[in-house]
Design a protein with these regions (language model features):
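Conserved ABC ATPase signature
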Residues: 144-148, 152
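Helix-to-loop junction immediately C-terminal to a conserved catalytic motif
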Residues: 57
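Catalytic Walker B motif of ABC-type/P-loop ATPase nucleotide-binding domains
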Residues: 169-172
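ABC ATPase NBD coupling module
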Residues: 74-90, 114, 120, 243-246
């Protein structure tokens, strides 16, 4: 469900540039994401998608331009403030990045123990609820991550991200490495997360089926080496259905190459 038209901005990029030495990754990138919006950031490898996510949570700063969280620049904030800001985000990594020495339950509880003073019985209740939400049975809680399939590890990562009740969910290639059936399970969970709580959802992905299933808006970045010096790096900003029928051949080729008939089915439901 799209947010209200007058929903306040939660994240803003204003003429953002990012260099690594002499290599420019982002050039003059501007967009606004409103509270409660669900947005996919797509594009070929090397176009700056992951850098964009890192800028959102203050893991790096723009070379020029500004990134705003709730209307205030992220750059220049103290480490203490950045730590508080990052607790507002839930991050689902491309690889689950679980602690192999800890049980599933302790992985999900990790952020709660590090960042809250909740008693253990309340932490245990939250862990149980989050595992239930992502469709994992109680028996999984005592297992180690190495005992789980890739799809189950993804679900544990999602449960951990949800444990601290984030305002903004960031998904970095959430279906990479999964078969179509498990990809559909993860896509459905992303939808359920949005349905159950007021949350802003940002998905970085190559999977256009995920785009068609889980978001209302698509932003496409294009690799700078293949753009003219005066061309904008954002070459598309619209709905998934509009992306599928976009007249720009660069958008059309990417979208159809990634999803084909499956995206058409999703976009025209």
């Amino acid at each position: 469900m799209p947010p209200e038209a007058d929903a306040p901005p939660i994240l803003e990029f204003h003429q953002v540039h990012r260099h690594f030495g002499h290599q420019q990754v982002l050039r003059d990138v501007s967009f606004t994401i409103r509270r409660g919006e669900s947005v996919a950031i797509i594009g070929e490898s090397g176009c700056g998608k992951s850098v964009t996510l890192k800028l959102m949570i203050g893991l790096m700063s723009p070379s020029s331009g500004s990134v705003l969280l709730d209307g205030a620049p992220i750059a220049g904030r103290s480490e203490q403030q950045l730590t508080r800001d990052r607790l507002r985000f839930g991050y689902v990594f491309q690889q689950a990045a679980l602690f192999d020495s800890l049980s599933v339950a302790d992985n999900v509880a990790f952020g709660l123990r590090q960042n809250t003073r909740l008693p253990e019985n309340e932490i245990a209740a939250i862990v149980h609820e989050r595992l239930r939400e992502v469709g994992l049975p109680d028996a999984v809680a005592a297992k180690k991550p190495a005992e789980l399939s890739g799809g189950m590890r993804k679900r544990v990562g999602l449960a951990r991200a949800l444990a601290l009740a984030p305002e903004i969910m960031l998904y970095d290639e959430p279906t990479t490495g999964l078969d179509p059936i498990m990809s559909d399970v993860i896509n459905e969970l992303i939808l359920q997360v949005r349905a159950r709580r007021p949350i802003t959802s940002i998905v970085v992905t190559h999977d256009m089926v995920t785009v068609g299933r889980t978001v209302d808006r698509v932003i496409m970045l294009y690799p700078l080496p293949r753009l003219g010096s005066d061309e904008p790096q954002i070459i598309f900003d619209g709905t998934p259905a509009e992306a599928f029928s976009a007249p720009d051949p660069r958008v059309y080729q990417f979208v159809h190459g990634q999803a084909g008939e499956r995206l058409l089915e999703m976009a025209t439901r």
